[in-house]
Curated annotation (Swiss-Prot):
GO biological process: rRNA import into mitochondrion; translation
Protein name: Large ribosomal subunit protein uL18m
Keywords: Chaperone, Mitochondrion, Ribonucleoprotein, Ribosomal protein, RNA-binding, Transit peptide, Transport
GO molecular function: 5S rRNA binding; structural constituent of ribosome
Source taxonomy: Eukaryota, Metazoa, Chordata, Craniata, Vertebrata
Location(s), subcellular: Mitochondrion
SUPFAM superfamilies: Translational machinery components
Predominant subcellular localization, coarse grouping: mitochondrion
Native source organism of the sequence: Bos taurus (Bovine)
């Protein structure tokens, strides 16, 4: 009976938004959470640690490995678009400068293949370009380098893939690096 009367006394206390009652406490006094000091939040730390590895790339300050002048394709990029054409399929990859594949799209994927009449046609290239552009934007990649060979640049399918990427919102040229 004594416990029931205490619970009725705690009910109005628990309804206050700033008060909390400890669950295993036997006292009826509410626990008040102390206010945070707003002056401490304005202080700037003397040492800054960058925990986002892509931050320098987005600011156009990160280094681009230049490689040798005689190397083709050039190694001066943060992200590069590679297109691999096999006998039956088309695959487009976005490669980071360290060699890792960040995003890819291919006509081997069932989600893309089921909408296509042919996995090698010009329309397939444009579809792969649009899907890859959407995936790049979802991953936060807005700029990349595309360096086609002269015979690739002249083909209709590669032109349509570029058009699909550009219409999707990806810029196929990276900003210049800021050296200062």
């Amino acid at each position: 009976m004594a416990l029931r009367s205490r619970s009725w006394e705690l009910l109005p206390v628990c309804r206050n938004p700033g008060c909390r009652v400890a669950a295993f406490s036997t006292s009826a006094k509410p626990v008040v959470k102390p206010e945070a000091d707003p002056v401490g939040n304005e202080a700037v730390a003397p040492e800054f640690t960058n925990r986002n590895p892509r931050n320098l790339e987005l600011l156009a300050v990160a280094r681009k490995e230049r490689g040798w002048g005689t190397v083709w394709p050039s190694r001066e990029f943060w992200h590069r678009l590679r297109v691999i054409r096999s006998q039956h399929h088309i695959e487009a990859l976005v490669e980071h400068r360290n060699g890792q594949v960040v995003v890819s799209a291919s006509t081997r994927e069932w989600a893309i293949k089921k909408h296509l009449y042919s996995t090698k046609s010009v329309v397939a290239c444009e579809s792969v370009g649009r899907v890859l552009a959407q995936r790049c934007l979802e991953a936060g990649i807005n700029f990349m380098v595309y360096q086609p060979t002269p015979w690739e640049a002249a083909s209709d399918s590669m032109k349509r893939l570029q058009i699909g990427m550009i219409e999707g919102g990806v810029v196929l040229q990276e900003p210049r690096r800021i050296y200062e």
